[in-house]
């Protein structure tokens, strides 16, 4: 029994030393916070799992899959309106000073208005830094997608003649809710405020006034083909 006890102690000490040794010779590529077990994307970039502390390698270590670099131009295909994804794209560009131009191809049914606002705000910031942002619509840009497509650099917003764009009144959804008259009035007030903000911005980048936009979307959707997008000032020319 005594020998068995001594043997158990020796084995425990040996195992302890082995574990400690593994920790000491742990490869530097393994995140010291997660050990690549849980939440590894907190410290590592996808899909290569290089530590985020390492600057992304030009031309292949992209933060998102729907972007690419061609010469001095960064291309991005916006299919879902996600501000975080666009921010990763812009942050990547700022790491690469040789990029002079940004092309955003919008092919999206829209999404969150607030994500759309943030994306437009980031676009304005990048343009203020000297970047030209060209927007392209080959197929479909609706709702917040339309807001983004119309917000590129003036003279650099292009559409296909067969493309379709759409703008509409804002909508809110509440399931299984019981509203009082004052609740409904407050919701209407907030929606009106948000609608006016969006329409005011579109009026500033297009040829329609706020009142004209309000009239065109009142209880219906405002659809524009490529020719109409250029005619109403939300695009500057046609893709060739």
What are these regions (language model features)?
Residues 2-8, 140:
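Sec-dependent signal peptide recognition
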Residues 5, 18-19:
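Generic extreme N-terminus detector
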């Amino acid at each position: 029994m005594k020998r068995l006890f001594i043997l158990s102690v020796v084995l425990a000490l040996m195992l302890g030393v082995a574990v400690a040794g593994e920790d000491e010779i742990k490869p530097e590529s393994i995140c010291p916070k997660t050990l690549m077990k849980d939440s590894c994307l907190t410290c590592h970039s996808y899909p290569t799992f290089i530590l985020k502390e390492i600057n992304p390698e030009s031309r292949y270590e992209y933060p998102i899959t729907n972007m690419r670099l061609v010469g001095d131009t960064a291309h991005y295909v916006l299919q879902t309106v996600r501000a975080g994804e666009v921010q990763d794209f812009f942050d990547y560009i700022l790491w690469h000073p040789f990029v002079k131009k940004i092309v955003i191809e919008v092919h999206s049914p829209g999404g969150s208005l607030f994500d759309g606002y943030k994306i437009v705000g980031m676009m304005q910031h990048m343009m203020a830094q000297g970047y030209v942002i060209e927007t392209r619509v080959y197929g479909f840009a609706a709702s917040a997608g339309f807001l983004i497509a119309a917000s590129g650099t003036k003279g650099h917003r292009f559409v296909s003649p067969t493309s379709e764009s759409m703008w509409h009144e804002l909508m809110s959804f509440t399931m299984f809710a019981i509203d009082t008259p004052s609740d409904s009035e407050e919701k209407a007030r907030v929606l009106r405020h948000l609608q006016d903000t969006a329409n005011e911005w579109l009026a500033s980048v297009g040829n329609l006034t706020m009142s004209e936009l309000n009239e065109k979307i009142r209880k219906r959707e405002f659809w524009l083909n490529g020719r109409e997008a250029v005619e109403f000032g939300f695009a500057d020319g046609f893709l060739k």
